[in-house]
Amino acid sequence: MHNDKDLSTWQTFRRLWPTIAPFKAGLIVAGVALILNAASDTFMLSLLKPLLDDGFGKTDRSVLVWMPLVVIGLMILRGITSYVSSYCISWVSGKVVMTMRRRLFGHMMGMPVSFFDKQSTGTLLSRITYDSEQVASSSSGALITVVREGASIIGLFIMMFYYSWQLSIILIVLAPIVSIAIRVVSKRFRNISKNMQNTMGQVTTSAEQMLKGHKEVLIFGGQEVETKRFDKVSNRMRLQGMKMVSASSISDPIIQLIASLALAFVLYAASFPSVMDNLTAGTITVVFSSMIALMRPLKSLTNVNAQFQRGMAACQTLFTILDSEQEKDEGKRVIERATGDVEFRNVTFTYPGRDVPALRNINLKIPAGKTVALVGRSGSGKSTIASLITRFYDIDEGEILMDGHDLREYTLASLRNQVALVSQNVHLFNDTVANNIAYARTEQYSREQIEEAARMAYAIDFINKMDNGLDTVIGENGVLLSGGQRQRIAIARALLRDSPILILDEATSALDTESERAIQAALDELQKNRTSLVIAHRLSTIEKADEIVVVEDGVIVERGTHNDLLEHRGVYAQLHKMQFGQ
C-alpha cells in the first residue's frame, strides 16, 4: 500500500476523479468553450495573410469589406465562450469543494477520540477549508490553462505547418527540451506545496489559540509570546511561498529562452533562398506572429505545473485523513434501554502513543440504579474510567460489560444512547438555548419537555431573563453565558436525554455554593433509578454515594462508603482532611 509520499500525481488525480466525474458534463461544456475560445484567437491570426496579401496588396479589395465583420463576430464568439467556460468551471469547482468538504466532515465525525488528541483544531480546520478549496481552485485553474493553451498551441502549430512546414519543424525539435525542463521542476513544486499545506495549518492553529484564549493572553501578558509564535509560523509560510515563486520564476525564463532561441533560429532559416521563395509578406507575418503568440501559452503551461502540483499536494493531504481508520463499530447488538448494570473486569488501558498504562487491572461493579463516585488526585485516571464506558477509547486487556454483555458487542450508536454525560468542560453550540438543551433531537421533544428540563436544572430563571428566552442564540460555545449557566444548560441536556446511565464528570465544579446546592438537589433526583458514575473533586457532593472508589496512579486503592473510608483513615480520609481541615 502506498502512502501519500509514494503516490504520484497521476495516481492522486485518479483517486480524485470519482469526485469530479459526476460533474463531467460541466467539464465537457467548458472544454468545448475553451477550445472554441482558442480557435477564435488562432483564426484571428490567420486573417493577417489575406489582409496583407489581398487587402493591402490590392489583389482583392473586398477583403477590407468583410474582414471587420469577421473580427466582430470572432470577438463576440470569444466573449461568449469565455463566459461559458468560466461559469462551468466555477460550477464544477464549487461542487467538488462541497463534495470534498462533506467527505472530510463526515469522515472526521467517525474518527476515534484518539485522532483528535493528536491533531490540533487549527490544522483540521485548515484541511476542511483551505486544502479542499486548494484542490478545486488549483485543479480547475490548471484545467483551464491546459485545455485553452493546449488548444492554442495545437492550432498555432497546425497553422504554422500549413503555411511553412520548414520553419515550423524547428520548434518541434526543441519540444523535448521543454518537456525535460517541466519534469525537473515538477518534483520541486510538489515538495514545496506539501510544506505549504502543513505550514498553513500551523498558522491557523496559532491564530486559533490566540482567539480562543485571548482573555488568558491579556491577563498573563502573553501578547509578545503569541506575536512571536505567530510571526514564526507566518515567516515560515512566507519562506515556503518564496521558494514556490523562486522555482516558478526559474522555469519561466527557461521556457522563454528556449522560445527565443527557436525564434532566432527561424529568422536565420527564413533567410535561406529555398525558404524565402515560398513565403509572401502575409505568410511570414502569420508564421512569426504565431511563433510569438506561442510564448504566452508555453509560459502558462509551464506555470500550470506549479498550480496543478499545489492542488495535488493538498489532495494527498486530504486523502491521508480519508485513509485514516475510523472508529471500530463491529457490534451487532442493539438495545432500546439498558437496565444499567456496568462492570469492569481486569481492565488495563494505555492511551495511544504512550507506553505507561493509564489504568491497570481495574475491577469495578456499578449495579443498576446505584451511584458510584470516583475520587482521587488530578491525573489519577478517574475521567479515563468514565471515557471507557462510552467507548471513546478501546481497552488493551480485560472487558467492560453492560447488562452482562461486552461493550464491543453493542453498536456504538446503541451504546452511547444509553449514556448521558455532563463534564467539567461543557461544549455548547452557536444555536438557541432550546436547541442546545435538545441537541440532535429537537424534533423529538416538545417545548414543555425542554422547559421542564431547564426548570429541573435550575436554569429557567436566567433563561427567562434573556431577550428571547429559550430562543436566544448563545454564541459560540455559549460565550454569552457564565460558566455556571453553561453547566446548568448541560445538566438540562442530560435531564432531557433521560438515559439509564449517567456520568457526572465534575458536573458542579463551575458553580457557586448557592447554585451547587440547588443543582445538587436536581442531580439527586436525576440519579434516582439510574446508574450513576460521579467524578468529583468536592467530596461534599459524593458523601451519599452508594460506593466511593479511590483511584491513584491508575489503580483502585480504596473503596467503600463515606463513613467506612473515613474510619479506614487511608487515602480518602487524607483527601477529606485536606478539604475540610478535620
Swiss-Prot record:
Annotated ABC transporter domain residues: 342-578
Gene3D superfamilies noted in UniProt: ABC transporter type 1, transmembrane domain, P-loop containing nucleotide triphosphate hydrolases
A Pfam family: ABC_tran
TM region(s), chain numbering: 16-36, 63-83, 153-173, 253-273, 275-295
Reaction equation(s) it catalyzes: ATP + H2O + lipid A-core oligosaccharideSide 1 = ADP + phosphate + lipid A-core oligosaccharideSide 2
Domain ABC transmembrane type-1: start-end pairs: 28-310
Residues annotated for ATP binding in this entry: G376, R377, S378, G379, S380, G381, K382, S383
UniProt GO MF annotations: ABC-type oligopeptide transporter activity; ATP binding; ATP hydrolysis activity; ATPase-coupled lipid transmembrane transporter activity
Coiled coil regions in record: none
EC number: 7.5.2.6
Keyword annotations of the record: ATP-binding, Cell inner membrane, Cell membrane, Lipid transport, Membrane, Nucleotide-binding, Translocase, Transmembrane, Transmembrane helix, Transport
Family from the record: Belongs to the ABC transporter superfamily. Lipid exporter (TC 3.A.1.106) family.
Protein name as it appears in the record: ATP-dependent lipid A-core flippase
Organism name: Shigella sonnei (strain Ss046)
Lineage: Bacteria, Pseudomonadati, Pseudomonadota, Gammaproteobacteria, Enterobacterales
